[in-house]
Amino acid sequence: VTSYAPDDRVMVSPRYMAGAGDRLADAIGPLIHLFGWSTQHDAATGHVAIDSPDGSVFVDFNPIQPLGRWWTIAHHEPYWEVQFSRQTPLEAVAAATQALPQLLGDTRHAERIPITDMPLDQLAALNGWSVEDGVLTSPDWCCQLRHTPNEDIVWRSEHAFFEKPPLATFTRDVPEGLVRNFFAHLTAPMAVERAFADVPLSTRFEHSDLITPVRGAVISPHVDHALAQLDRPGRRR
């Protein structure tokens, strides 16, 4: 078993086992710098509030939210809401936040920020997830995206090893493009980079084979990680 210092950079896959990570700028930076959304930042608490130019959407990041619901995206008329937890990979959060301007009709930078049109069941099959009775389940059974069309929350992503709240919730009337983009980046097979201290405890201690070091990679961190996963036991095909 490899020993890591807290600040060692490591590669982790699958992404839903990697925790949030530290690339907060990817989730909020494009809205501010590319699309001119207004922002308020409380340096003492880390709270960030971002509003769309027309005032129809706001994005709220609150890292001291007591229930761990760090992210809220809300739209007015019709009202819909998306929430992400403190363990949701920022790659998946950013895939949703960066899609917001385009979904509101601002097509600038659309070529740089694609919104996938692949149906969710095809995305699941592409990445080895199973689909049954409205539930999309990861190959290792650790993560699910559940569709409950008759409830107020119509999509819910949950993780077997993380405490509540869910990784993500989507209420009725959320554009499905947001759900697709989130799911595409949650299930993508490419490993993500983390500081070891940011990797969830359950992954560090119970699934340490999912972690490989960045430093000392023979080919590249991504390739070395992929090769290390080829013979990992317990993978459902």
What are these regions (language model features)?
Residues V1-R237:
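Compositionally biased accessory segments in Actinobacterial proteins
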